[in-house]
């Protein structure tokens, strides 16, 4: 299976949800709302909003939980996955999810102060799969 690289720009729907796997690996789940701007004649308007679950691992997860808050506009790069699911009542659906390689605040409408951490923040080398 080939990874599909994506870059998303959108708004964080809630504060990051940080937890730790049974193996002790930090993981943060985020929900990102992405609304494209579309040209309608002489004016711009909002297109349909898409929602993505974004998963961050290790140091990136901890940094996201320490830094980000609901409403922040983010730039996310990662690998897209489409997950199939079935609800309790038997309905089937699909969900778009992104395993984040990197993320940060969008500076288009905000400013940020950067604080460097030592080392690589506990991140695996780029391209390493998340823990199983």
Please give the residue ranges for each predicted region:
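OB-fold and OB-like beta-barrel modules that bind single-stranded nucleic acids
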Residues: 8-12, 32, 70-82, 100
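Conserved positions in beta-strands of structured domains
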Residues: 13, 17-19, 57, 81-83, ...
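Beta-rich strand-turn-strand
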Residues: 57-93
